[in-house]
């Protein structure tokens, strides 16, 4: 199946490796915290808010939202493990789009405000995904959960984020849905089409 993938490290011929950065280690503590209880998860997120404030104060560019990203991924993984175990783990999968237009939209959302040097690092590829039945999810639910965790002030907000994760894995469409293809199967980069981002 032909799909589209953005990367700053891949090149034509690359076989994409699931979780090549080993980010699962950053997610696991949040999953463990939720297995204990919501209060434990809340406290871990609060520690992350403190680190975000420290990193922001010392101008450590692009570092201040990392703990929110991993907390959100941990919450989604907890929901997946407990309610949707047959679906792929987000962290141990690769992400794709079914069209160049969707890839361009994500590029603008993620790197639209970055300086040109950062934007130039991102390449757009056509890939051959060897998965007959990849998962298709509305990425807006993840973004909504991220925003809730970013502003986390109460345990009720954790329940809201859990509901967003259920919507994501349950295949529910948001009003302005944006689908991503998530697969833990082999994919090979076949063509660099970065010029189509412009």
Roles of regions detected by a PLM:
Residues 2, 8-62, 90-92, 101-114, ...:
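Conserved NAD+-utilizing ADP-ribose enzyme module
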